[in-house]
């Protein structure tokens, strides 16, 4: 600091370059670290403890293998004058470099060394008044650990974008070194908190063989193919060397250090919250259930969860948990005081009308505008056929006949309804039939494989026609189906039989939603892209800059899921009907996963909901015009596609440049052959030899990470927080006329219905979880936003991104206007709950949509 003052007084500043570093508060970022407050007094602590060295992009050091010349060390320090105002939780430090432009050239990278005893989070370093360059920005967004933790220098490049062939020669070795460090091929693990290694592994850490609770290894075999997850390098279990040992709940599972949220993200809150549920609230719920009859008896009993709450018994574990968790994170999390009142906010589905969920209209509307609107397909043949192998399952053709449905076809015959695109099906029959014998052998589980036929009315709403409930029936070597068809009824016991039939459908749909639409098709399939991008694409690569925001926190939330949610005996197995067979079932589904069908237009065409239409902006035409998920989603898809197309065209003027991009080709090869290696021989993989292939792939990746995940995640509590609307488990069969159970249904239909679906314990546990998982954080970064305005120096890219953001804001207005249109009946429905899950929320720059809002498309899968 005194040296800087001397230079000012003597005028010796000709070779000085001023810089400004932005650091994040440790106290804000890591509430568990009680030394963090000491670090936040940056003026007292830092002094000479953080040093910086500029690296030339234009002048090579021939004594250092032609690498860019490295300048002398400069210290971060508090400035003499008042610094510009900073955002909450940020600290700004100045730095002054001795750098002769005519001798050292243009700075293109910066080396940071942390000589302090603990880590800090560096956001950016900006050089001001650089001769010939004006401003140079180094974007870090990285945890910097003490220098002894690394066997290499931490280096950050200026925010320019370079294809590998365009990288300044003096910086090329640094670029290659950095990728080699991230690949960590020479490091087997177990990896530590400070490590930055991205490697692959199979899902071999879900079970605990040493405690007689094994689960099959998913990935790496024909029997159980699966996407890869991030490697932790933990030691194998004693009983099964192919399974990885697990950590205790409170231990932090490894993810590369910069994948751990450097912000008070909702995924951080989720980590504490889920552990609070498992360690504190879950035992309290068990005790409560043991001390009471253990069941809800009426819908009114369930509604008490949202009115007065439940008084849980005093559990010592809750007090111990309260002491161990950061105060900021538990204010609204753990029940407080001697009464331990557990109360939930009222879900949107029952806010305006507590019984609308029971109607056929709302049941059908949610198939188009609910939690799982990506399963319905157009029926093209009648009766519906099965795709199951007839040599194993016999003839599984539906038993629904024209007599079951023609009275509700508004004067049409079945063939006429088919020909006019008026028949649709929610078909879970083939999804679950192969697994029902195992599933129904679990304690407390009895469910069906369901088919639901629907008719498209003139006003574009759907009308349920029939529900087929099927069970496996073993005949010799065949597992055929034993089925019964139920049709709508509006009064008497028949209406409650119909209500139960819809509940069995909802159970199927809930399981498929959580297991496939949500976990497999967003969380699991995205992780290989995250790993491959960090291993093969430099941070200076334009495709890295395009995709990186859509990976934020994904590895972290997936690691948390493996630790507490999808593991053997975890919350998922306890609350969703496939139980311990759930993940193995998702592996069977993954066998038929196809990356090229994950984009919305291709998905809609595959399901017969849309046809190709070159004249349409989205190139498809919907056959159900009022299909909120698809209507909004196509607008989002088109905006993403236009943005990606404009962006990629800046860097790839022709296919030859793309084909010669060694990093891009290595990235795509690794995605296919390693990350999704169990499907590497599929013929649908794009060859990545043309610009359209790249733009389609990147558009699909961004779609999955943002809009698709938002559609299946942030409506969980609003739609399913009231379990009768979306039960996750069924526990007994449909009662047969003349049976004791049929009499029970007739005498007390509410009680029978509630005792058939998810139990009291499972309900409270499940609702506790999805309340957490449905929340947005105050610092959520939505589609069309970036966490760092200086993410690139390229003005063409910045202008294209502004156009993208403006287009998303325009979509917001269109969504709100459609929700006000009384002719679009599927937008709001009988429950008076508008569909906003595909509302981008790009216009929200202040975190106004914090909490459970049922709107907003975050950039990434972070919860």
Swiss-Prot record:
UniProt keyword Glycosyltransferase present: no
Sequence positions that bind Fe cation: 518, 523, 709, 713, 863
Chief localization: cytoplasm
Cofactor binding mode and count: Binds 1 Fe cation per subunit. Iron is tightly bound.
GO cellular component: cytoplasm
PROSITE patterns attached to this UniProt entry: LIPOXYGENASE_1, LIPOXYGENASE_2, LIPOXYGENASE_3, PLAT
Entry function: Plant lipoxygenase may be involved in a number of diverse aspects of plant physiology including growth and development, pest resistance, and senescence or responses to wounding.
Region (Disordered): 204-244
Protein name listed in UniProt: Linoleate 9S-lipoxygenase 1
